[in-house]
Amino acid sequence: RAPAALRGKPAAAPGAVIISSSDAHTFALWYFRYAEGRREDVAILNAGLLQYDWYVENVRHLHPGLAMLLECPTCLEKLLAANLPFRPVYLTDPALLPGRAYSLRPAWPLYQVIGRD
């Protein structure tokens, strides 16, 4: 599923953030992004690694335009709130969706995060 997000007709809009829930999805997406040079406009984050300072610093270095919150980098809801006004955000797993402030739109093989009105 994950590689389909980066090849062929793009599932993710230009400049998107893709937040992955598993190593399998993350490594496949990273391979297509970094090894094959596809979709260099897309930022790929692993939700499980956001708890580590070294990972957050690496993400800040690789994607300086991405809003990474200093006070709570693991707060996915705050990460979504900071980035959704400026970039489309997708999840590889709908179970990652925090709270009720957002809904999902299927964008196979991903799920686009949509703010509720």
Regions found by a protein language model. Give the residues of each.
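ER/secretory pathway lumenal C-terminal domains and tails of membrane proteins involved
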Residues: 1-117
